A protein has these predicted regions:
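Conserved active-site segments centered on acidic
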Residues: 1-80, 145-153
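Phosphate-binding/catalytic loops
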Residues: 89, 93-153
Length: 153
């Protein structure tokens, strides 16, 4: 049985870099089934804006004035028609340990048939942010293919 997700949430540590970049990239892709796309963090102490390096990389890739405010993943974000994709395996485990009824939690790479994590960018130079953007762009293409193929079933 194919699950028809109504929402997809990307999750990273504090929702100011990798997850919002993935969200913004995916929102520009064509999905055959309308899907609400959001991002959240595991540890959001206050609603901070997008990381300046992530913002610079997005701007240089044609996202004019990307804006984002970090939000904490909450129990009410999670239900049976929500697909949650984490950047790292430890975040997936944290969600299973912290939240109830989280049946559809995968890492981004796991969901598209790859192994490994999308590593944290904390303290990294702009070039590493750019490399992460390129990796996320490729992963989002694979994700679109998977989501659209599931819609056809």
């Amino acid at each position: 049985m194919v699950i028809r997700y109504k929402k997809l949430i990307f999750v990273d540590t504090n929702d100011n870099c990798r997850a919002p970049m993935a969200e913004m990239i995916l929102k520009r892709k064509f999905l055959t089934n309308p899907l609400t796309i959001e991002s959240r963090g595991m540890v959001v102490l206050f609603p901070e804006p997008l990381n300046p390096k992530a913002e610079a990389v997005l701007t240089s890739n044609g996202y004019p004035q990307p804006s984002h405010i970090a939000m904490q993943l909450e129990q009410e974000d999670i239900n049976n028609d929500v697909l949650i994709l984490t950047m790292e395996d430890k975040q997936k485990s944290q969600i299973w340990e912290t939240y109830e009824n989280a049946p559809h939690v995968y890492t981004v790479k796991e969901y598209v048939g790859e192994n490994g994590d999308i590593p944290s960018l904390h303290g990294q130079p702009l070039t590493v942010y750019s490399q992460c953007y390129t990796e996320l762009e490729l992963l989002m293409r694979k994700l679109v293919t998977r989501l659209n193929e599931e819609e056809e079933l």
